């Protein structure tokens, strides 16, 4: 029987085969006509790749069927080397969650029940209300805008 093999270039080859022929035999015939080694050939029929040991009858290939020939690609991308680090990884800072942390900014007077601020609020308009200044040993400092008040030094 006669089958057709269509190559990637669009060229169609006709082969004289029997339904009992193996895929290996078909690839050998393609090598005789085209010079492509069988290990580089991949034959596709009805969307399936044909395995070498099977026969044409296994795939229900009848007379005047068309097989598609594609070339096998070898290799792929180069393997990348794994990076080796000289120093150990830096530990990330963990945020310390303090429950009821707001209580350290205010004090409630027991006798009068009056609330007083323990920290100084930043007067800058950019910071807004509720932005407290850090209390250092010699100054008050706003971390948001950088405003600093230095205490009077007694000589």
Swiss-Prot record:
GO terms of molecular function: mRNA binding; structural constituent of ribosome; zinc ion binding
Cysteine pairings via disulfide bonds: none
Organism: Hordeum vulgare (Barley)
Database matches in SMART domains: Ribosomal_S27, UBQ
Family matches, as InterPro entries: Ribosomal_eS31, Ribosomal_eS31_euk-type_sf, Ribosomal_zn-bd, Ubiquitin-like_dom, Ubiquitin-like_domsf, Ubiquitin_CS, Ubiquitin_dom, Ubiquitin_ubiquitin-like
Record domain Ubiquitin-like: where: 1-76
Superkingdom of source: Eukaryota
Miscellaneous notes: Ubiquitin is generally synthesized as a polyubiquitin precursor with tandem head to tail repeats. Often, there are one to three additional amino acids after the last repeat, removed in the mature protein. Alternatively, ubiquitin extension protein is synthesized as a single copy of ubiquitin fused to a ribosomal protein (either eL40 or eS31) or to an ubiquitin-related protein (either RUB1 or RUB2). Following translation, extension protein is cleaved from ubiquitin.
Residue(s) of cross-link: Glycyl lysine isopeptide (Gly-Lys) (interchain with K-? in acceptor proteins): 76
CDD domains, A to Z: Ubl_ubiquitin
Swiss-Prot/TrEMBL GO biological process terms: translation
Family per similarity comment: In the N-terminal section; belongs to the ubiquitin family.
Protein name, as recorded: Ubiquitin-ribosomal protein eS31y fusion protein
Cross-link (Glycyl lysine isopeptide (Lys-Gly) (interchain with G-Cter in ubiquitin)): 48
C4-type Zn finger ranges: 122-145
Keywords from the UniProt entry: Cytoplasm, Isopeptide bond, Metal-binding, Nucleus, Ribonucleoprotein, Ribosomal protein, Ubl conjugation, Zinc, Zinc-finger
UniProt xrefs under Pfam families: Ribosomal_S27 (PF01599), ubiquitin (PF00240)
Cellular component GO terms held in the UniProt record: cytoplasm; nucleus; ribonucleoprotein complex; ribosome
């Amino acid at each position: 029987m006669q089958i057709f093999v269509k190559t990637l270039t669009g060229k169609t080859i006709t082969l004289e085969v029997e339904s009992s022929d193996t895929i290996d035999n078909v690839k050998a015939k393609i090598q005789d006509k085209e010079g492509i080694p069988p290990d580089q050939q991949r034959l596709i029929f009805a969307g399936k790749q044909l395995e070498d040991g099977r026969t044409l009858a296994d795939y229900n290939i009848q007379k005047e069927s068309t097989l598609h020939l594609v070339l096998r690609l070898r290799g792929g991308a180069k393997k990348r080397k794994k990076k080796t680090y000289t120093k150990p990884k830096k530990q990330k800072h963990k945020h310390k969650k303090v429950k009821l942390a707001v209580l350290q900014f205010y004090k409630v007077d027991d006798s009068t029940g009056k609330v007083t601020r323990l920290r100084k609020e930043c007067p800058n308009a950019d910071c807004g209300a509720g932005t407290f200044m850090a209390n250092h040993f010699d100054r008050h400092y706003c971390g948001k805008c950088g405003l600093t008040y230095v205490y009077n030094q007694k000589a």
